[in-house]
Amino acid sequence: MTDISNRPRTWWENGTVSASLLAVAVLAGSLASDKWVPNSQLTLPLLISTSVAALVAAAGIPRLKALKMGQVIRVEGPQAHQSKAGTPTMGGLLVVPVGTIVGGLISLEGTEAQQLLAVSAITLGYMVIGGFDDWRSLTRQTNTGLTPRGKLLLQSLMGVLFLAVAAWQGWISSSVSLPFGWTLPLGWLIWPLGLFVFLAESNATNLTDGLDGLASGCGALVFLGMAVQLMLRGHTGDPALAGFCMTMAGAWLGFLMHNRHPARAFMGDTGSLAMGAALSGVALLSDSLWPLLVMGGVFLAESLSVIIQVWVFKTTKGPDGQGRRVFRMAPLHHHFELGGTSERTVVPCFWLATAGFVLLGLLLRPTI
């Protein structure tokens, strides 16, 4: 591996600079939407949520330290990450409620209010699952909390509950809207697909949360993209769910002020699972599965890298127990790290990739 420790840093490798540029980009996107898209009011929820989340995180992180909520770093991970041991985790507990509470206040009556309540509930539910997982990791002083099967079961139960309420209310379309006026009719298959989306997206965002500011920055951009495409759809857009997306984007921007390199706190499973659940809930209620798939391209790549790595290793494993590896290490961000690219470079590059996927998702958004 290339030695990068003594190499001079470029300006984009400064965590404060790169995080500030990301925040400016998200703000510019919301301002542009408010100026040119009818009925768009994305900036105010963004600013309120960002400010409150940043303040709550600033007040809460010292408390996490006092409670000894220090992250346990996995031994088999990159050696450079061992210096992160002891950094407070469970940061999602500080900012996810901010996004859901501010988002829930956008509409207080009618179907919009009910949908906001449902999305907030599934987001907080996954936050609790992630929190339980983080807590078990901390109390056991290992990098693993819940068993994979146990975590999957809890995620599935929460997803089924959300889908049952949505089915009862008739909120979810049985077809998936695609670009160019195409639709994919699924009928009853939309329900197993919906559960798969919750499981896949929440675990993809969880896998992405491996470098300082990576998941929080990517999440803020994807929430912005989802909000803008919601306002561009139909005649009046979907101001309520779009506003919720912006409060979640703001929550992660506020957290990024403390999660940028060098991170003062990690979101933990508490935050990453909640992020994926919020995106999934919004996508299912607004028939935005296609935009989420495209805009979350980095999340998808991180998840696929793990699936490919495990599959190839198992299928090529010999008598000595060793198999081939496609990547130096999975998820994908570790592959670049072990190739000699610094964490400070990988993160803004993944942010730029996410911004590109968001723009592509806006260009290829469904028209209905």
Swiss-Prot record:
Subcellular location: Cell inner membrane
Cofactor(s) needed for function: Mg(2+)
Domain of life, source organism: Bacteria
Gene Ontology, cellular component aspect: plasma membrane
UniProt pathway: Cell wall biogenesis; peptidoglycan biosynthesis
Residue ranges of the TM segments: 11-31, 42-62, 88-108, 112-132, 152-172, 180-200, 211-231, 237-257, 265-285, 293-313, 346-366
Catalysed reactions, as listed in the record: UDP-N-acetyl-alpha-D-muramoyl-L-alanyl-gamma-D-glutamyl-meso-2,6-diaminopimeloyl-D-alanyl-D-alanine + di-trans,octa-cis-undecaprenyl phosphate = di-trans,octa-cis-undecaprenyl diphospho-N-acetyl-alpha-D-muramoyl-L-alanyl-D-glutamyl-meso-2,6-diaminopimeloyl-D-alanyl-D-alanine + UMP
Gene Ontology biological process terms from the UniProt entry: cell division; cell wall organization; peptidoglycan biosynthetic process; regulation of cell shape
UniProt KW keywords: Cell cycle, Cell division, Cell inner membrane, Cell membrane, Cell shape, Cell wall biogenesis/degradation, Magnesium, Membrane, Metal-binding, Peptidoglycan synthesis, Transferase, Transmembrane, Transmembrane helix
Major location category of this protein: membrane
Membrane topology: Multi-pass membrane protein
Enzyme Commission number: 2.7.8.13
MF terms in GO: metal ion binding; phospho-N-acetylmuramoyl-pentapeptide-transferase activity; UDP-N-acetylmuramoyl-L-alanyl-D-glutamyl-meso-2,6-diaminopimelyl-D-alanyl-D-alanine:undecaprenyl-phosphate transferase activity
Class of the enzyme per the UniProt entry, highest EC level: transferase
Annotated function: Catalyzes the initial step of the lipid cycle reactions in the biosynthesis of the cell wall peptidoglycan: transfers peptidoglycan precursor phospho-MurNAc-pentapeptide from UDP-MurNAc-pentapeptide onto the lipid carrier undecaprenyl phosphate, yielding undecaprenyl-pyrophosphoryl-MurNAc-pentapeptide, known as lipid I.
Family statement: Belongs to the glycosyltransferase 4 family. MraY subfamily.
Protein name: Phospho-N-acetylmuramoyl-pentapeptide-transferase
Organism of provenance: Parasynechococcus marenigrum (strain WH8102)
